[in-house]
Amino acid sequence: MSADGGGIQDTQDKETPPEVPDRGHPHQEMPSKLGEAVPSGDTQESLHIKMEPEEPHSEGASQEDGAQGAWGWAPLSHGSKEKALFLPGGALPSPRIPVLSREGRTRDRQMAAALLTAWSQMPVTFEDVALYLSREEWGRLDHTQQNFYRDVLQKKNGLSLGFPFSRPFWAPQAHGKGEASGSSRQAGDEKEWRGACTGAVEVGQRVQTSSVAALGNVKPFRTRAGRVQWGVPQCAQEAACGRSSGPAKDSGQPAEPDRTPDAAPPDPSPTEPQEYRVPEKPNEEEKGAPESGEEGLAPDSEVGRKSYRCEQCGKGFSWHSHLVTHRRTHTGEKPYACTDCGKRFGRSSHLIQHQIIHTGEKPYTCPACRKSFSHHSTLIQHQRIHTGEKPYVCDRCAKRFTRRSDLVTHQGTHTGAKPHKCPICAKCFTQSSALVTHQRTHTGVKPYPCPECGKCFSQRSNLIAHNRTHTGEKPYHCLDCGKSFSHSSHLTAHQRTHRGVRPYACPLCGKSFSRRSNLHRHEKIHTTGPKALAMLMLGAAAAGALATPPPAPT
Protein backbone atom coordinates (compact mmCIF):
# COMPACT_ATOMS: atom_id res chain seq x y z
CA MET A 1 0.00 0.00 0.00
CA SER A 2 1.40 3.40 -0.93
CA ALA A 3 0.28 6.95 -0.41
CA ASP A 4 1.02 10.15 -2.35
CA GLY A 5 3.56 12.54 -0.92
CA GLY A 6 5.54 10.11 1.15
CA GLY A 7 3.41 7.06 1.88
CA ILE A 8 4.83 3.98 3.49
CA GLN A 9 6.54 1.77 0.95
CA ASP A 10 8.12 -0.87 3.11
CA THR A 11 7.36 -4.35 1.82
CA GLN A 12 8.37 -5.85 5.10
CA ASP A 13 5.59 -3.94 6.82
CA LYS A 14 3.09 -5.24 4.30
CA GLU A 15 4.07 -8.81 4.96
CA THR A 16 4.00 -8.44 8.73
CA PRO A 17 1.12 -6.23 9.91
CA PRO A 18 1.54 -4.51 13.27
CA GLU A 19 0.47 -6.71 16.10
CA VAL A 20 -2.22 -5.58 18.48
CA PRO A 21 -1.05 -5.74 22.09
CA ASP A 22 -3.07 -7.44 24.73
CA ARG A 23 -5.93 -5.34 26.05
CA GLY A 24 -4.81 -5.67 29.60
CA HIS A 25 -1.31 -4.36 28.85
CA PRO A 26 -1.71 -1.60 26.25
CA HIS A 27 1.62 0.04 27.04
CA GLN A 28 3.98 -2.71 26.01
CA GLU A 29 4.37 -3.12 22.25
CA MET A 30 2.56 -0.30 20.43
CA PRO A 31 5.24 2.41 20.76
CA SER A 32 7.91 0.15 19.34
CA LYS A 33 5.71 -0.83 16.43
CA LEU A 34 4.96 2.79 15.68
CA GLY A 35 8.65 3.59 15.87
CA GLU A 36 9.40 0.90 13.32
CA ALA A 37 6.63 2.02 11.01
CA VAL A 38 7.41 5.74 11.02
CA PRO A 39 10.37 6.76 8.90
CA SER A 40 12.31 9.85 9.87
CA GLY A 41 13.52 11.04 6.53
CA ASP A 42 10.48 12.44 4.74
CA THR A 43 9.77 15.55 6.74
CA GLN A 44 9.11 18.10 3.98
CA GLU A 45 7.18 16.03 1.45
CA SER A 46 3.59 17.20 1.86
CA LEU A 47 1.76 20.25 3.08
CA HIS A 48 -1.57 18.58 3.69
CA ILE A 49 -3.06 15.22 4.45
CA LYS A 50 -3.84 13.01 1.51
CA MET A 51 -4.62 9.33 1.73
CA GLU A 52 -4.76 6.82 -1.07
CA PRO A 53 -8.36 6.03 -1.99
CA GLU A 54 -9.50 2.54 -1.28
CA GLU A 55 -8.78 0.18 -4.18
CA PRO A 56 -9.96 -3.33 -4.79
CA HIS A 57 -7.45 -6.02 -3.87
CA SER A 58 -7.12 -9.62 -4.59
CA GLU A 59 -7.84 -12.36 -2.14
CA GLY A 60 -4.15 -12.62 -1.41
CA ALA A 61 -4.09 -9.09 -0.25
CA SER A 62 -7.02 -9.38 2.13
CA GLN A 63 -4.67 -9.86 5.04
CA GLU A 64 -2.86 -6.67 4.10
CA ASP A 65 -6.14 -4.74 4.06
CA GLY A 66 -6.96 -6.10 7.45
CA ALA A 67 -3.81 -4.58 8.82
CA GLN A 68 -3.79 -1.30 6.91
CA GLY A 69 -7.54 -0.75 6.64
CA ALA A 70 -8.00 0.01 10.33
CA TRP A 71 -5.56 2.91 10.29
CA GLY A 72 -3.17 4.57 7.90
CA TRP A 73 -0.26 6.98 7.84
CA ALA A 74 -0.84 10.62 6.94
CA PRO A 75 2.35 12.58 6.18
CA LEU A 76 2.58 16.11 7.49
CA SER A 77 5.59 18.32 6.99
CA HIS A 78 7.45 19.43 10.10
CA GLY A 79 7.45 23.20 10.51
CA SER A 80 5.08 23.91 7.63
CA LYS A 81 2.67 26.80 7.76
CA GLU A 82 -0.35 24.52 7.56
CA LYS A 83 -1.52 22.02 10.13
CA ALA A 84 -4.27 19.45 9.89
CA LEU A 85 -6.83 19.64 12.70
CA PHE A 86 -9.03 16.60 13.20
CA LEU A 87 -10.41 17.00 16.72
CA PRO A 88 -9.61 19.06 19.81
CA GLY A 89 -8.32 16.88 22.54
CA GLY A 90 -5.35 14.87 21.34
CA ALA A 91 -2.04 15.98 19.89
CA LEU A 92 -0.09 13.69 17.61
CA PRO A 93 3.60 13.72 16.75
CA SER A 94 4.87 14.87 13.42
CA PRO A 95 6.11 14.33 10.74
CA ARG A 96 3.88 11.24 10.21
CA ILE A 97 0.61 10.95 12.05
CA PRO A 98 -1.60 7.88 12.47
CA VAL A 99 -5.11 8.87 11.39
CA LEU A 100 -8.23 6.89 12.07
CA SER A 101 -10.05 6.07 8.85
CA ARG A 102 -13.20 7.95 7.85
CA GLU A 103 -14.18 5.64 4.97
CA GLY A 104 -16.36 3.30 7.00
CA ARG A 105 -13.68 0.65 7.43
CA THR A 106 -13.92 -1.89 10.21
CA ARG A 107 -12.68 -0.57 13.55
CA ASP A 108 -11.23 -2.82 16.17
CA ARG A 109 -11.44 -1.86 19.83
CA GLN A 110 -8.09 -3.32 20.69
CA MET A 111 -6.45 -1.37 17.87
CA ALA A 112 -8.02 1.84 19.15
CA ALA A 113 -6.82 1.14 22.67
CA ALA A 114 -3.33 0.37 21.42
CA LEU A 115 -3.31 3.53 19.33
CA LEU A 116 -4.33 5.65 22.32
CA THR A 117 -1.60 4.01 24.36
CA ALA A 118 0.96 4.87 21.72
CA TRP A 119 -0.14 8.51 21.70
CA SER A 120 0.20 8.76 25.49
CA GLN A 121 3.87 7.72 25.32
CA MET A 122 4.87 10.08 22.51
CA PRO A 123 6.41 13.53 23.18
CA VAL A 124 3.53 15.55 21.79
CA THR A 125 2.41 19.13 22.27
CA PHE A 126 -0.76 21.02 21.52
CA GLU A 127 1.04 22.84 18.73
CA ASP A 128 0.84 19.64 16.69
CA VAL A 129 -2.39 18.46 15.17
CA ALA A 130 -5.32 17.06 17.15
CA LEU A 131 -7.49 14.06 16.39
CA TYR A 132 -11.25 13.87 16.06
CA LEU A 133 -13.22 10.75 16.84
CA SER A 134 -16.65 10.47 15.34
CA ARG A 135 -19.58 9.64 17.57
CA GLU A 136 -19.67 6.14 16.15
CA GLU A 137 -15.95 5.64 16.77
CA TRP A 138 -16.25 6.96 20.30
CA GLY A 139 -19.12 4.59 21.00
CA ARG A 140 -17.00 1.61 20.08
CA LEU A 141 -14.64 2.36 22.96
CA ASP A 142 -15.57 0.89 26.31
CA HIS A 143 -15.76 2.97 29.48
CA THR A 144 -12.15 2.25 30.49
CA GLN A 145 -10.80 3.27 27.09
CA GLN A 146 -12.87 6.47 27.08
CA ASN A 147 -11.51 7.46 30.50
CA PHE A 148 -8.01 6.60 29.36
CA TYR A 149 -8.48 8.78 26.26
CA ARG A 150 -9.55 11.73 28.43
CA ASP A 151 -6.61 11.23 30.80
CA VAL A 152 -4.17 11.29 27.89
CA LEU A 153 -5.63 14.53 26.55
CA GLN A 154 -5.63 16.21 29.95
CA LYS A 155 -2.00 15.32 30.59
CA LYS A 156 -0.81 16.44 27.17
CA ASN A 157 -2.90 19.58 26.77
CA GLY A 158 -3.46 20.63 30.37
CA LEU A 159 -7.14 21.21 29.66
CA SER A 160 -10.27 19.19 30.27
CA LEU A 161 -11.82 18.99 26.84
CA GLY A 162 -14.53 16.45 27.59
CA PHE A 163 -15.89 14.28 24.80
CA PRO A 164 -13.92 14.56 21.56
CA PHE A 165 -16.85 14.35 19.19
CA SER A 166 -19.04 17.20 20.46
CA ARG A 167 -18.76 20.36 22.49
CA PRO A 168 -18.31 19.79 26.22
CA PHE A 169 -21.46 20.35 28.20
CA TRP A 170 -19.69 22.84 30.45
CA ALA A 171 -18.02 24.84 27.70
CA PRO A 172 -18.66 28.59 28.05
CA GLN A 173 -19.47 30.97 25.28
CA ALA A 174 -16.33 31.39 23.24
CA HIS A 175 -16.67 34.50 21.16
CA GLY A 176 -15.54 34.00 17.63
CA LYS A 177 -12.42 35.98 16.89
CA GLY A 178 -10.83 36.40 13.54
CA GLU A 179 -10.59 38.86 10.72
CA ALA A 180 -10.49 38.22 7.03
CA SER A 181 -8.26 40.29 4.78
CA GLY A 182 -10.67 40.25 1.86
CA SER A 183 -14.13 39.17 0.82
CA SER A 184 -12.86 36.33 -1.34
CA ARG A 185 -10.57 35.02 1.38
CA GLN A 186 -13.35 35.28 3.93
CA ALA A 187 -15.69 33.30 1.71
CA GLY A 188 -13.08 30.62 1.13
CA ASP A 189 -12.23 30.29 4.80
CA GLU A 190 -15.88 30.11 5.75
CA LYS A 191 -16.44 27.36 3.22
CA GLU A 192 -13.54 25.33 4.52
CA TRP A 193 -14.50 25.71 8.17
CA ARG A 194 -18.16 25.02 7.56
CA GLY A 195 -17.28 21.53 6.48
CA ALA A 196 -14.83 21.10 9.30
CA CYS A 197 -17.31 22.04 12.02
CA THR A 198 -19.62 19.20 11.04
CA GLY A 199 -17.35 16.65 12.67
CA ALA A 200 -14.31 15.54 10.69
CA VAL A 201 -11.88 16.93 8.17
CA GLU A 202 -12.15 15.38 4.76
CA VAL A 203 -9.16 13.60 3.29
CA GLY A 204 -6.93 15.99 1.39
CA GLN A 205 -8.55 19.12 2.87
CA ARG A 206 -6.30 22.06 3.72
CA VAL A 207 -6.59 23.75 7.09
CA GLN A 208 -5.36 27.30 7.72
CA THR A 209 -2.96 27.91 10.60
CA SER A 210 -4.64 31.20 11.50
CA SER A 211 -7.77 29.29 12.44
CA VAL A 212 -5.82 26.79 14.50
CA ALA A 213 -4.71 29.69 16.68
CA ALA A 214 -8.33 30.07 17.77
CA LEU A 215 -7.73 27.16 20.13
CA GLY A 216 -6.17 29.72 22.42
CA ASN A 217 -9.56 31.30 23.08
CA VAL A 218 -9.80 29.90 26.57
CA LYS A 219 -12.34 31.60 28.82
CA PRO A 220 -12.69 31.20 32.59
CA PHE A 221 -16.09 30.89 34.17
CA ARG A 222 -17.57 30.10 37.56
CA THR A 223 -19.94 27.20 38.07
CA ARG A 224 -22.90 27.29 40.38
CA ALA A 225 -20.85 25.38 42.95
CA GLY A 226 -18.37 28.26 43.01
CA ARG A 227 -15.54 26.45 41.25
CA VAL A 228 -13.64 28.21 38.50
CA GLN A 229 -13.16 26.10 35.40
CA TRP A 230 -11.56 26.76 32.06
CA GLY A 231 -13.26 26.06 28.79
CA VAL A 232 -12.12 26.11 25.19
CA PRO A 233 -14.02 26.04 21.93
CA GLN A 234 -14.75 22.48 20.91
CA CYS A 235 -12.74 23.07 17.79
CA ALA A 236 -10.94 25.96 16.22
CA GLN A 237 -13.36 25.81 13.31
CA GLU A 238 -16.22 26.92 15.52
CA ALA A 239 -14.29 29.94 16.74
CA ALA A 240 -13.48 30.93 13.18
CA CYS A 241 -17.09 30.45 12.09
CA GLY A 242 -18.22 32.70 14.91
CA ARG A 243 -20.09 29.92 16.66
CA SER A 244 -19.88 29.42 20.38
CA SER A 245 -20.68 26.73 22.86
CA GLY A 246 -23.03 27.68 25.63
CA PRO A 247 -23.94 25.90 28.84
CA ALA A 248 -25.97 22.75 28.64
CA LYS A 249 -29.73 23.00 28.66
CA ASP A 250 -32.23 20.57 30.11
CA SER A 251 -32.38 18.67 26.87
CA GLY A 252 -28.66 17.91 27.07
CA GLN A 253 -27.82 19.79 23.88
CA PRO A 254 -25.48 22.78 24.02
CA ALA A 255 -26.86 26.15 23.11
CA GLU A 256 -25.54 27.69 19.91
CA PRO A 257 -26.27 31.42 19.70
CA ASP A 258 -25.91 32.89 16.25
CA ARG A 259 -22.75 34.92 15.89
CA THR A 260 -21.01 36.24 12.85
CA PRO A 261 -17.32 37.02 12.37
CA ASP A 262 -18.18 40.66 11.64
CA ALA A 263 -19.73 41.12 15.07
CA ALA A 264 -16.88 39.45 16.90
CA PRO A 265 -14.04 41.47 18.41
CA PRO A 266 -10.62 41.29 16.75
CA ASP A 267 -8.39 38.39 17.64
CA PRO A 268 -5.33 39.27 19.73
CA SER A 269 -1.96 37.85 18.90
CA PRO A 270 -1.88 34.12 19.72
CA THR A 271 1.58 34.51 21.20
CA GLU A 272 0.49 37.08 23.78
CA PRO A 273 -0.78 35.60 27.07
CA GLN A 274 -4.26 36.67 28.00
CA GLU A 275 -5.15 37.41 31.61
CA TYR A 276 -8.59 36.97 33.06
CA ARG A 277 -9.68 38.25 36.43
CA VAL A 278 -12.26 36.30 38.40
CA PRO A 279 -13.83 38.33 41.22
CA GLU A 280 -13.27 36.89 44.66
CA LYS A 281 -16.18 35.26 46.40
CA PRO A 282 -17.48 37.46 49.27
CA ASN A 283 -17.64 36.10 52.78
CA GLU A 284 -20.78 34.96 54.51
CA GLU A 285 -21.51 38.49 55.69
CA GLU A 286 -21.47 39.77 52.16
CA LYS A 287 -24.06 37.44 50.70
CA GLY A 288 -26.15 38.85 47.94
CA ALA A 289 -23.22 40.26 46.03
CA PRO A 290 -24.21 41.05 42.46
CA GLU A 291 -23.39 38.45 39.88
CA SER A 292 -23.41 38.98 36.16
CA GLY A 293 -24.40 36.15 33.89
CA GLU A 294 -25.87 32.75 34.61
CA GLU A 295 -22.60 31.36 35.91
CA GLY A 296 -21.84 34.31 38.21
CA LEU A 297 -18.73 35.70 36.51
CA ALA A 298 -18.68 39.48 36.36
CA PRO A 299 -17.91 40.85 32.90
CA ASP A 300 -14.67 42.67 32.29
CA SER A 301 -16.46 46.01 32.25
CA GLU A 302 -17.85 45.40 35.75
CA VAL A 303 -14.58 44.31 37.35
CA GLY A 304 -13.22 47.03 39.62
CA ARG A 305 -16.24 49.30 39.13
CA LYS A 306 -17.89 50.83 42.22
CA SER A 307 -21.41 51.11 40.90
CA TYR A 308 -23.19 51.19 44.29
CA ARG A 309 -23.06 54.63 45.92
CA CYS A 310 -24.31 55.90 49.24
CA GLU A 311 -27.02 58.51 48.87
CA GLN A 312 -25.84 60.48 51.92
CA CYS A 313 -22.05 60.64 51.61
CA GLY A 314 -21.50 59.49 48.02
CA LYS A 315 -19.05 56.72 48.91
CA GLY A 316 -18.85 53.96 46.28
CA PHE A 317 -18.83 50.18 46.72
CA SER A 318 -18.35 47.22 44.42
CA TRP A 319 -20.96 45.05 46.13
CA HIS A 320 -24.48 45.90 47.22
CA SER A 321 -23.98 44.12 50.55
CA HIS A 322 -21.11 46.49 51.36
CA LEU A 323 -23.42 49.44 50.73
CA VAL A 324 -26.06 47.96 53.04
CA THR A 325 -23.47 47.56 55.81
CA HIS A 326 -22.20 51.10 55.26
CA ARG A 327 -25.68 52.60 55.55
CA ARG A 328 -25.83 51.40 59.15
CA THR A 329 -23.17 53.98 60.03
CA HIS A 330 -25.66 56.69 59.07
CA THR A 331 -28.80 55.11 60.52
CA GLY A 332 -27.16 53.77 63.68
CA GLU A 333 -28.73 50.36 63.16
CA LYS A 334 -27.04 47.53 65.07
CA PRO A 335 -28.81 44.26 64.25
CA TYR A 336 -26.29 41.91 65.89
CA ALA A 337 -26.75 41.61 69.67
CA CYS A 338 -24.59 39.78 72.18
CA THR A 339 -26.55 37.12 74.06
CA ASP A 340 -24.42 37.54 77.21
CA CYS A 341 -24.37 41.29 77.81
CA GLY A 342 -26.85 42.59 75.23
CA LYS A 343 -24.35 44.86 73.50
CA ARG A 344 -25.22 45.42 69.85
CA PHE A 345 -23.04 45.71 66.78
CA GLY A 346 -23.46 46.76 63.18
CA ARG A 347 -21.41 43.87 61.78
CA SER A 348 -21.44 40.20 62.61
CA SER A 349 -17.64 40.11 62.59
CA HIS A 350 -17.57 42.71 65.37
CA LEU A 351 -19.95 40.59 67.42
CA ILE A 352 -17.71 37.55 67.02
CA GLN A 353 -14.72 39.54 68.22
CA HIS A 354 -16.69 40.82 71.18
CA GLN A 355 -17.83 37.37 72.29
CA ILE A 356 -14.21 36.37 72.93
CA ILE A 357 -14.30 38.72 75.93
CA HIS A 358 -16.96 36.57 77.61
CA THR A 359 -15.29 33.26 76.86
CA GLY A 360 -11.95 34.47 78.22
CA GLU A 361 -10.08 32.96 75.30
CA LYS A 362 -6.73 34.57 74.55
CA PRO A 363 -5.20 32.71 71.61
CA TYR A 364 -2.63 35.36 70.66
CA THR A 365 0.60 35.29 72.70
CA CYS A 366 3.47 37.76 72.57
CA PRO A 367 6.71 35.88 71.83
CA ALA A 368 8.75 38.45 73.78
CA CYS A 369 6.95 38.54 77.14
CA ARG A 370 4.47 35.65 76.72
CA LYS A 371 1.53 37.92 77.44
CA SER A 372 -1.71 36.73 75.83
CA PHE A 373 -4.42 38.69 74.07
CA SER A 374 -7.88 37.94 72.78
CA HIS A 375 -7.45 39.84 69.49
CA HIS A 376 -4.66 39.83 66.97
CA SER A 377 -4.83 43.61 66.55
CA THR A 378 -4.25 44.04 70.29
CA LEU A 379 -1.17 41.84 70.06
CA ILE A 380 0.21 43.97 67.22
CA GLN A 381 -0.28 47.13 69.28
CA HIS A 382 1.38 45.49 72.27
CA GLN A 383 4.42 44.41 70.27
CA ARG A 384 5.12 48.07 69.48
CA ILE A 385 6.05 48.47 73.14
CA HIS A 386 8.96 46.09 72.60
CA THR A 387 9.98 47.46 69.22
CA GLY A 388 9.43 51.13 70.12
CA GLU A 389 7.50 51.69 66.90
CA LYS A 390 5.19 54.70 66.85
CA PRO A 391 3.59 54.87 63.41
CA TYR A 392 0.97 57.54 64.19
CA VAL A 393 2.27 61.12 64.01
CA CYS A 394 0.47 64.32 64.91
CA ASP A 395 0.50 66.68 61.94
CA ARG A 396 0.69 69.75 64.21
CA CYS A 397 3.33 68.99 66.82
CA ALA A 398 4.94 65.89 65.26
CA LYS A 399 4.35 63.87 68.42
CA ARG A 400 4.21 60.14 67.74
CA PHE A 401 1.93 57.46 69.17
CA THR A 402 1.71 53.70 69.09
CA ARG A 403 -2.08 53.66 68.78
CA ARG A 404 -4.39 55.54 66.50
CA SER A 405 -6.85 56.14 69.32
CA ASP A 406 -4.12 57.88 71.32
CA LEU A 407 -3.44 60.16 68.37
CA VAL A 408 -7.11 61.07 68.07
CA THR A 409 -7.22 61.87 71.78
CA HIS A 410 -4.10 63.98 71.50
CA GLN A 411 -5.43 65.94 68.54
CA GLY A 412 -8.30 67.07 70.75
CA THR A 413 -5.80 69.10 72.77
CA HIS A 414 -5.03 71.17 69.66
CA THR A 415 -8.59 71.67 68.48
CA GLY A 416 -10.25 71.76 71.89
CA ALA A 417 -13.12 69.73 70.48
CA LYS A 418 -15.15 67.68 72.94
CA PRO A 419 -17.87 66.07 70.87
CA HIS A 420 -19.12 63.63 73.51
CA LYS A 421 -21.55 65.32 75.89
CA CYS A 422 -23.11 63.87 79.00
CA PRO A 423 -26.92 64.13 78.74
CA ILE A 424 -27.29 64.48 82.54
CA CYS A 425 -24.77 67.14 83.54
CA ALA A 426 -23.83 68.41 80.05
CA LYS A 427 -20.14 67.77 80.68
CA CYS A 428 -18.18 67.18 77.50
CA PHE A 429 -15.39 64.75 76.74
CA THR A 430 -12.99 64.15 73.91
CA GLN A 431 -13.53 60.36 73.88
CA SER A 432 -16.65 58.26 74.04
CA SER A 433 -14.98 55.87 76.48
CA ALA A 434 -14.40 58.77 78.87
CA LEU A 435 -18.08 59.64 78.61
CA VAL A 436 -19.10 56.06 79.42
CA THR A 437 -16.83 56.05 82.46
CA HIS A 438 -18.23 59.40 83.58
CA GLN A 439 -21.84 58.25 83.31
CA ARG A 440 -21.13 55.58 85.91
CA THR A 441 -20.80 58.36 88.46
CA HIS A 442 -24.46 59.18 87.83
CA THR A 443 -25.75 55.63 87.69
CA GLY A 444 -23.48 54.25 90.44
CA VAL A 445 -22.57 51.19 88.36
CA LYS A 446 -19.31 49.52 89.40
CA PRO A 447 -18.88 46.54 87.07
CA TYR A 448 -15.32 45.62 88.10
CA PRO A 449 -15.21 43.67 91.40
CA CYS A 450 -12.02 42.61 93.14
CA PRO A 451 -11.75 38.80 93.28
CA GLU A 452 -9.86 39.00 96.61
CA CYS A 453 -11.92 41.36 98.76
CA GLY A 454 -15.03 41.90 96.64
CA LYS A 455 -14.59 45.66 96.40
CA CYS A 456 -16.06 47.08 93.20
CA PHE A 457 -14.77 49.81 90.95
CA SER A 458 -16.20 51.84 88.13
CA GLN A 459 -13.04 51.69 86.05
CA ARG A 460 -10.90 48.74 85.14
CA SER A 461 -7.71 50.71 85.70
CA ASN A 462 -8.75 51.33 89.30
CA LEU A 463 -9.27 47.61 89.82
CA ILE A 464 -5.81 46.85 88.42
CA ALA A 465 -4.26 49.42 90.73
CA HIS A 466 -6.22 48.03 93.68
CA ASN A 467 -5.03 44.48 93.01
CA ARG A 468 -1.46 45.63 93.67
CA THR A 469 -2.37 46.23 97.29
CA HIS A 470 -2.99 42.49 97.58
CA THR A 471 0.02 41.36 95.57
CA GLY A 472 2.44 44.02 96.83
CA GLU A 473 3.62 44.75 93.31
CA LYS A 474 5.33 48.11 92.75
CA PRO A 475 6.16 48.36 89.05
CA TYR A 476 6.97 52.11 88.97
CA HIS A 477 10.56 53.00 89.94
CA CYS A 478 12.14 56.39 90.49
CA LEU A 479 15.24 56.85 88.34
CA ASP A 480 16.80 59.30 90.85
CA CYS A 481 16.56 57.38 94.13
CA GLY A 482 15.29 53.96 93.04
CA LYS A 483 12.17 54.12 95.20
CA SER A 484 9.23 52.05 93.88
CA PHE A 485 5.53 52.80 93.80
CA SER A 486 2.37 50.88 93.03
CA HIS A 487 0.72 53.78 91.16
CA SER A 488 2.14 55.92 88.39
CA SER A 489 0.58 59.02 89.95
CA HIS A 490 2.56 58.40 93.15
CA LEU A 491 5.77 58.22 91.13
CA THR A 492 4.94 61.48 89.36
CA ALA A 493 4.30 63.26 92.66
CA HIS A 494 7.50 61.83 94.15
CA GLN A 495 9.62 63.06 91.25
CA ARG A 496 8.57 66.66 92.07
CA THR A 497 10.47 66.43 95.32
CA HIS A 498 13.68 65.95 93.34
CA ARG A 499 12.92 68.77 90.94
CA GLY A 500 11.43 71.20 93.47
CA VAL A 501 8.26 71.70 91.47
CA ARG A 502 5.20 72.81 93.49
CA PRO A 503 2.35 73.42 91.12
CA TYR A 504 -0.46 73.61 93.73
CA ALA A 505 -0.78 77.03 95.49
CA CYS A 506 -3.20 78.12 98.23
CA PRO A 507 -5.49 80.91 97.01
CA LEU A 508 -5.71 82.46 100.54
CA CYS A 509 -2.11 82.62 101.67
CA GLY A 510 -0.24 81.73 98.48
CA LYS A 511 1.63 78.76 99.93
CA SER A 512 2.61 76.13 97.30
CA PHE A 513 2.65 72.36 97.44
CA SER A 514 3.92 69.50 95.27
CA ARG A 515 0.79 67.37 95.74
CA ARG A 516 -2.85 68.23 95.48
CA SER A 517 -3.63 66.25 98.62
CA ASN A 518 -1.26 68.45 100.62
CA LEU A 519 -3.05 71.55 99.34
CA HIS A 520 -6.43 70.17 100.44
CA ARG A 521 -5.02 69.44 103.88
CA HIS A 522 -3.68 73.00 104.10
CA GLU A 523 -6.98 74.60 103.10
CA LYS A 524 -8.65 73.17 106.19
CA ILE A 525 -6.50 75.48 108.29
CA HIS A 526 -8.31 78.44 106.83
CA THR A 527 -11.78 77.00 107.39
CA THR A 528 -11.70 75.00 110.69
CA GLY A 529 -9.70 74.64 113.92
CA PRO A 530 -8.20 77.20 116.37
CA LYS A 531 -5.94 78.64 113.75
CA ALA A 532 -8.89 79.26 111.54
CA LEU A 533 -10.69 81.05 114.44
CA ALA A 534 -7.65 83.24 115.12
CA MET A 535 -7.43 84.06 111.47
CA LEU A 536 -11.08 84.99 111.45
CA MET A 537 -10.62 87.27 114.47
CA LEU A 538 -7.61 88.94 112.97
CA GLY A 539 -9.46 89.32 109.78
CA ALA A 540 -12.46 90.87 111.51
CA ALA A 541 -10.27 93.27 113.49
CA ALA A 542 -8.50 94.27 110.37
CA ALA A 543 -11.77 94.75 108.62
CA GLY A 544 -13.15 96.83 111.54
CA ALA A 545 -10.10 99.01 111.61
CA LEU A 546 -10.49 99.69 107.99
CA ALA A 547 -14.19 100.36 108.39
CA THR A 548 -13.81 102.81 111.41
CA PRO A 549 -13.36 106.34 110.12
CA PRO A 550 -10.42 108.26 111.53
CA PRO A 551 -11.12 110.84 114.34
CA ALA A 552 -11.70 114.42 113.32
CA PRO A 553 -8.80 116.81 113.91
CA THR A 554 -9.13 119.32 116.69
Curated annotation (Swiss-Prot):
Expressed in heart, skeletal muscle, pancreas and brain. Weakly expressed in placenta, lung, liver, kidney and thymus. There is a cross-link at residue 219 (Glycyl lysine isopeptide (Lys-Gly) (interchain with G-Cter in SUMO2)). The modification Phosphoserine is found at residue 292. A zinc finger (C2H2-type) spans 308-330, 336-358, 364-386, 392-414, 420-442, 448-470, 476-498, 504-526. GO terms for biological process: negative regulation of transcription by RNA polymerase II; positive regulation of hydrogen peroxide biosynthetic process; positive regulation of mitochondrial outer membrane permeabilization involved in apoptotic signaling pathway; regulation of DNA-templated transcription; regulation of transcription by RNA polymerase II. Residues 124-193 form the KRAB domain. Residues 1-74, 173-195, 240-303 are annotated as: Disordered. Keywords: DNA-binding, Isopeptide bond, Metal-binding, Nucleus, Phosphoprotein, Repeat, Transcription, Transcription regulation, Ubl conjugation, Zinc, Zinc-finger. GO terms for molecular function: DNA-binding transcription factor activity, RNA polymerase II-specific; DNA-binding transcription repressor activity, RNA polymerase II-specific; RNA polymerase II cis-regulatory region sequence-specific DNA binding; zinc ion binding. It comes from the Eukaryota. The keyword Ubl conjugation applies. InterPro entries: KRAB (IPR001909), KRAB_dom_sf (IPR036051), Zinc_finger (IPR050331), Znf_C2H2_sf (IPR036236), Znf_C2H2_type (IPR013087). GO terms for cellular component: mitochondrion; nucleus. It is found in: Nucleus. PANTHER family: C2H2-TYPE DOMAIN-CONTAINING PROTEIN, PR DOMAIN ZINC FINGER PROTEIN. Belongs to the krueppel C2H2-type zinc-finger protein family. Transcriptional repressor involved in regulating MPV17L expression. By regulating MPV17L expression, contributes to the regulation of genes involved in H(2)O(2) metabolism and the mitochondrial apoptotic cascade. The KRAB domain is required for transcriptional repression. This is Transcriptional repressor RHIT. It comes from Homo sapiens (Human). The gene is ZNF205.
